[in-house]
Amino acid sequence: KTFPELDPTQIPMAHPVKEEKVFYLLDPGGASRRSAGLKVVDKLARGLRWMLPYEEHAVELPYIPEFLKKEDGLLLSIGQFNQWVGNQLMGSGLVQIWPGTPVDSPLVEEGQVEGVRLVDQGTDRQGNPDTGYMPGMDIRAGLTVVGDGPIGPVGRQLDEEFGLPEGHHQREWAVGMKMVVDLPEDCALEPGTVIHTFGYPEPEIFGFMYVYPERVASLGIFVPSWMDSPVRTSYRYLQHWMMHPALWRYLEGGSMRSWGAKTLQESGMRGEPRLVGDGFARIGEGSGSTNVLTGSGVDEAWTTGVLLAEGVIELYKEGKPFTQKNLDKAYVRRRRQSWVEHEGHEAAQARDGFQRGFLSGLIGMGLTGLTRGVINLPGRSKPPHARVPSLETFYRGKISAQEIEELRARAAAEGTSVHDALMARVGWDEIPYDGKLLLSQQDALLVGGKVQAPPGYADHVVFLYPSLCENCDNKLCIEVCSGEAITSAEDGGVPEFDREKCVHCGACVWNCTQPREEGSERGNIEFRAGAGGLHSAEN
């Protein structure tokens, strides 16, 4: 609707959806953590494989529910799409875009947002003035539109300043990690193919693969906060997922083009912040627009921006200021009457069942989707730091507490994460690096398209209270870090941070197991504005 005369061929990598497949992936190696109920499901699937669409340790679902179908949709590289949109906007002469300009904070004066302040430049890593120091510029405006995503510093500061609406929370998260790859020449997948998976490498991890023209594919996994594991290593899990026989038959012989990761806000409408206030409005994923039933967020985020634009034009024509009252009428009312709101309400409780377990979650999603939100499976959410057990509890009966302590001490001495040793100990195979598609995490940083962090800026990942880190025996921030930018300190205290490796995914923020104060739902890690770390233009 925004581009009624759009020719998809103008956008690099765009292609209409042609075919959809959903696979339930069984564990081919026996290392996956599966409940008793899921083991029964797996046994039945293998026992009845002669009558099921079973192949390569996977069952293809014969029916895809309407709420999961992507037909009539368009496969896009968001990076390429954003560049294309940016060119359209700049070409209009009405908009300026300042890429690579980190915004430090909102300017809040007497309860009203007057604009934003850019980060200081010419500082040391602690933010102290250094050579070429220049304080951050203040940019003032009648209306500040905040669309900096779920872990953006401006949006999070507004949440702290004004609070979330009563009854709302932001407890469900996921880290999405993906690659763009060149498929092997003999790959049989056609452009427009959409593949979704669930069940492996751990039951809670969902996967996807989208095939673009010229044998290029985007593929990846989502690791959710309700996966109650202290070993949330997205990169290693991504490699195990790719090597599942049902997928490896398409990928073997391919090569990585680019790689990246980002945090997703999975609370849906219940994570909606205050959408407007005097001088500001919220749009996009950080405004609670993601549909947690269909797992879609791009169309919804885009539409929130369109709705705000319509409201702003209305107020401008009427000569009215951008007050909370006026924005409520012009924007929020439009949003409440939109398809985003309607479908978001239907989906609001879709994932509550996952609070009870994986199978309960699948049943709950099915009930919500098939009844359009009338029937839901209830579940009680918890803050992320209240969900994660200790390593000793998680591996009880498999690895002794003494051995875990030895592995932990060795990892601290080597400045590495402990997940590789733990996963090997419980039966996960080593990754057979091939230098093309299966790369070490550090090699992926080098060839995956990451933008390096320039000097002259303060570190953007900050451990607020050292004592909390020193008393933490489960440094999940190290295990989950997408770029291995957070590593163990020699003394086992405050982790070390190397911003050259940071991909700005924000996973450390919601994986911190130490609340910054009693009763707080926020951890001890603060994610501030910073330069560099962005993904390649196609990822």
Stretches found by the model and what they are:
Residues K1-L52:
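N-terminal FAD cofactor-binding segment of flavoenzymes
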Residues S77-R249, L307:
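Predominantly flavin-linked oxidoreductase catalytic cores and closely associated redox partners
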Residues C472-E500, A507-A537:
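Iron-sulfur cluster-binding cysteine motifs and their immediate structural context
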Residues G220, D228-G254, R270-T304, A309-L315, ...:
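C-terminal catalytic lobe of FAD-dependent flavoproteins
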Residues F354-I431:
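C-terminal auxiliary extensions adjacent to catalytic cores
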